[in-house]
């Protein structure tokens, strides 16, 4: 069965309480349940991992026990060459996803180290963006088989 890693970066554990006007009111657990339901309908397995620590996210990627990934790098999107390098090194496709649209926010969020190595980016669509991203990565992984 196709296995998709949903990798959540720093501060995403605070969903539902951190700046809900930007990130919404759904908690990370609620978001993951929604993704699980959608994955069930697609016939794929999803695994979730969230960390506030860059090295832990990279270590999880290095496990390479998945066919593709959804990645919300949080603030690391704008700063982490190491995360980018790990994504390139593992040779697994991923879709970048963000609840908000970083390009329409503060100037420092205009830098994106991940977008050009992702197979697609889904931004600014709230929790529904994760479902769209899952559809995209499942289609992409299916076309590689």
Language-model features and meaning:
Residues 68-103:
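Mid-chain, well-packed structural core segment of small domains
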């Amino acid at each position: 069965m196709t296995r998709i890693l949903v990798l959540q970066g720093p501060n995403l554990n605070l969903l539902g309480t951190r700046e809900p006007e930007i990130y919404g009111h759904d908690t990370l657990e609620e978001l993951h349940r929604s993704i699980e339901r959608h994955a069930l309908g697609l016939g794929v397995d999803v695994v979730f991992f969230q960390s506030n620590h860059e090295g832990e996210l990279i270590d999880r990627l290095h496990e390479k026990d998945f066919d593709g990934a959804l990645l919300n790098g949080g603030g690391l999107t704008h700063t982490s060459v190491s995360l980018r390098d790990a994504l390139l090194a593992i040779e697994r496709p991923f879709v970048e996803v963000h609840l908000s649209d970083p390009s329409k926010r503060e100037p420092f969020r205009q830098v994106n180290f991940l977008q050009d190595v992702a197979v697609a980016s889904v931004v600014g669509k709230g929790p529904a963006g994760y479902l769209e991203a899952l559809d995209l990565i499942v289609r992409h992984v299916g076309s590689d088989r």
